[in-house]
C-alpha cells in the first residue's frame, strides 16, 4: 500500500526525522491559511498523488512569494497530472502539500528496500540526489552505493561509516547521520514497509539533515497489525476495479490490454500474461482468483474484468490441483448464464477431472464459449478473438 508524501512526513516526524514545516491543502482557502502560518518567502507546493515524476510533469512548484504560491496552488488543485508512473489518463490532483523552502548545500538520494535475491534489506544511497535514481543508475552508476543489511543483525555503525566515506560528508556528522538511518530503519522494520525513499535528503547550511521528499510503501499482507497505516489508504489513487477486487479478496491489477485473464495461482497468471504477449496480444489485467476458483469466484472475476470496456475476450486458465476442474466448469457455466458477458470466453482447463470439465463446457451450448486443453493454443485463440481475426 502506498501513501502520500504528507502522510510519510508525519511518520518521519514521529520517529525524529527532520522535515520542513508544512501542511496539506484541498482548496485555496486552506492553502492561504497554511501560507500565513509558514515563515520565509520561499515555498514548495507539491501535488499529492501516488506516482513519481511529479516535478518533470509540472506537479512541483517553487514560489518566491505568498502571492505566487496562491497562483501555483490554483493551477495545481484540480489538474490532471500525467507522469511515467501514472495511468495514461493521469491522476486528478485533489490535494497539495505546501512547505517552507530550505537552503541546503548537498542533496542525497537514500532508500531502504527489500532485495529478494539476497533476502536482505538494501540501503541505497546516491551522491546525485533530487533526480531520478533510474536515470542515475543508467548514466552515472558510480554515484550509487548499495549496502546489504542482514535483518537478523540490523543496521550497524559501520554501515553509517561506509556511507560517510562514500558521500564524502564531514565525519563530525557521523552521529547525526547514524541517528537518521537508525530512525528510518525502525520505521521500515516496525511498520512492515516495502520501501522508504527520501529523494532528496538534504544537508542544510547549519549541518542538519532534512527529508525534503518522502515516499513510503507498505506490505499489504501485514496491514492487519498496523491499523494506523491502513487508515492512511487513499482509494482515489487506485483504480475502482482494484478497490472492488480487494473487497472481494481477489488479486487484481488493471493493465492496458484487451485480453481479460482469469487464472488461479500467481505464477500461472504471470506465465499466461507472458504467452499472450508473445503471441502478439496484451493482457487487460492480472487476476489470480486463488482459492476463490469457484462458481461464485469466477462470476465475480468476470464482472470485475467486464468493468473495463477495452476487454474484447476473457481467457480463463485454470490448473486443477486441489480444485477439481469439473467444479470450475460448473462455475463457469453458471457465471456465463448469470452474467451477460458480451465478449467471447476461452477456457483452458488442465488437471483433476479436466476431461469431464471440458466435456461439460462443450455440451453447455453456450454462445461464444470456446475450450482448449492446451495453454498455448488457448492463448492463441484468445489473442485472435481479441483482434477480431476469428
UniProtKB/Swiss-Prot annotation:
Gene field: sucC
The protein's annotated pathway: Carbohydrate metabolism; tricarboxylic acid cycle; succinate from succinyl-CoA (ligase route): step 1/1
Species of origin: Campylobacter curvus (strain 525.92)
First-tier enzyme category under EC: ligase
Catalytic activity: succinate + ATP + CoA = succinyl-CoA + ADP + phosphate; GTP + succinate + CoA = succinyl-CoA + GDP + phosphate
SUPFAM superfamilies: Glutathione synthetase ATP-binding domain-like (SSF56059), Succinyl-CoA synthetase domains (SSF52210)
GO CC list: cytosol; succinate-CoA ligase complex
Official protein name in the record: Succinate--CoA ligase [ADP-forming] subunit beta
UniProt: substrate binding residues: 264, 321-323
A single GO BP: succinyl-CoA metabolic process
UniProt EC number: 6.2.1.5
Cofactor note: Binds 1 Mg(2+) ion per subunit.
Amino acid at each position: 500500500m502506498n501513501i502520500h508524501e504528507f502522510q510519510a512526513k508525519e511518520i518521519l516526524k514521529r520517529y525524529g526525522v527532520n522535515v520542513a514545516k508544512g501542511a496539506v491543502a484541498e482548496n485555496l482557502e486552506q492553502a492561504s491559511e497554511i501560507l500565513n502560518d509558514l515563515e520565509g518567502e520561499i515555498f514548495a507546493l507539491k501535488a499529492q498523488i501516488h506516482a513519481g515524476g511529479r516535478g518533470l510533469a509540472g506537479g512541483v512548484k517553487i514560489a518566491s512569494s505568498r502571492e505566487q504560491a496562491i497562483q501555483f496552488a490554483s493551477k495545481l488543485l484540480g489538474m490532471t497530472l500525467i507522469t511515467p508512473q501514472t495511468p495514461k489518463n493521469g491522476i486528478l490532483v485533489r490535494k497539495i502539500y505546501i512547505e517552507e523552502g530550505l537552503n541546503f548545500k548537498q542533496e542525497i538520494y537514500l532508500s531502504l528496500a527489500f532485495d529478494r535475491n539476497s533476502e536482505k534489506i538494501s540501503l541505497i544511497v546516491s551522491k546525485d540526489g533530487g533526480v531520478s535514481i533510474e536515470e542515475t543508475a543508467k548514466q552515472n552508476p558510480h554515484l550509487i552505493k548499495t549496502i546489504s543489511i542482514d535483518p537478523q543483525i540490523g543496521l550497524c555503525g559501520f554501515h553509517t561509516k561506509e556511507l560517510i566515506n562514500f558521500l564524502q560528508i564531514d565525519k563530525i556528522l557521523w552521529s547525526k547521520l547514524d541517528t537518521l538511518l537508525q530512525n528510518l530503519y525502525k520505521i521500515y522494520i516496525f511498520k512492515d514497509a516495502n520501501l522508504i525513499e527520501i529523494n532528496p535528503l538534504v544537508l542544510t547550511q547549519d549541518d542538519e539533515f532534512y527529508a525534503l521528499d518522502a515516499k513510503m510503501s507498505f506490505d499489504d499482507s501485514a496491514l492487519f497489525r498496523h491499523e494506523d497505516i491502513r487508515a492512511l489508504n487513499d482509494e482515489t489513487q487506485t483504480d475502482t476495479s482494484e478497490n472492488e477486487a480487494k473487497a472481494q479478496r481477489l488479486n487484481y491489477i488493471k493493465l492496458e490490454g484487451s485480453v481479460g485473464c482469469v487464472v488461479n495461482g500467481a505464477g500461472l497468471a504471470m506465465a499466461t500474461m507472458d504467452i499472450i504477449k508473445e503471441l502478439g496480444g496484451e493482457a487487460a489485467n492480472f487476476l489470480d482468483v486463488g482459492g476463490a476458483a469457484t462458481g461464485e469466484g469466477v462470476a465475480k472475476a468476470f464482472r470485475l474484468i467486464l468493468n473495463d470496456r477495452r476487454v474484447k475476450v476473457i481467457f480463463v486458465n485454470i490448473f486443477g490441483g486441489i480444485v477439481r476442474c469439473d467444479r470450475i466448469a460448473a462455475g463457469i457455466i453458471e457465471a456465463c448464464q448469470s452474467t451477460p458477458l458480451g465478449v467471447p470466453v476461452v477456457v483452458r482447463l488442465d488437471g483433476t477431472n479436466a476431461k469431464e470439465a471440458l466435456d461439460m463446457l462443450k455440451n453447455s451450448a453456450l454462445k461464444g464459449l470456446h475450450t482448449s486443453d492446451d495453454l498455448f493454443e488457448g492463448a492463441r485463440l484468445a489473442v485472435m478473438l481479441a483482434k477480431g481475426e476469428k
